[in-house]
Amino acid sequence: DGLDLRFFSLDLDDLRDAGHRVGGTVNTAFVAAVALGVSDHHADSPSTGPVRVSIPISTRAADDGVGNHWTPTRVDLDVGADSEPDDVAREVLRHSAGLRDDPARSLVPVLTALPDATTAALFSAAASAHDVAASNVPRSPVLLYLCGEPVRELIPFGPLSGAAVNVTLMSYGRTAHIGISSDPAAIADPGGLAHCLQQSFTALVKGS
């Protein structure tokens, strides 16, 4: 009765190129692909509306010290069966630009001063109104070793934090690893969801 965990990988340069193609970044392509995959998975659902994605926004400045330097936010993406991958990526980019002027950013100094447990609780409460939580975990800039042997892959699995699904990206070397955590009580076909997500990443990399 625990979480369902699945993963897949793709070329990091391909994902980066997909983001650059619309003037964005790896994270732009990542969030767009997650929204597309979740939308495809729910294509036969009677419910309609935008895909609500919870994403952490970094607030760290160059001279920041230790502590929390992120704030949770939600983007509502209008994604449907006829949506072109690049168009969804452009919508993500527009939302990201708008977040820089979000009045809620004035609360960032307060959030960064809070204890980790308090910040995590706030993030969990905010995520409960989302369809999926998407996280891009910073990668190691160097090759890692364990017991003298090189680590070949790093597969990330993020907490649900109140959402039904968490999709996490961690790049290692030249590979982007995608980990999917889902609540079996909310996702009846986790294998189907993972397939839809993998297909959406492939479609975004190919372009539209």
Give, region by region, the residue ranges found by the protein language model:
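Low-complexity, glycine/alanine/valine/leucine- and proline-rich hydrophobic stretches
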Residues: D131-T202
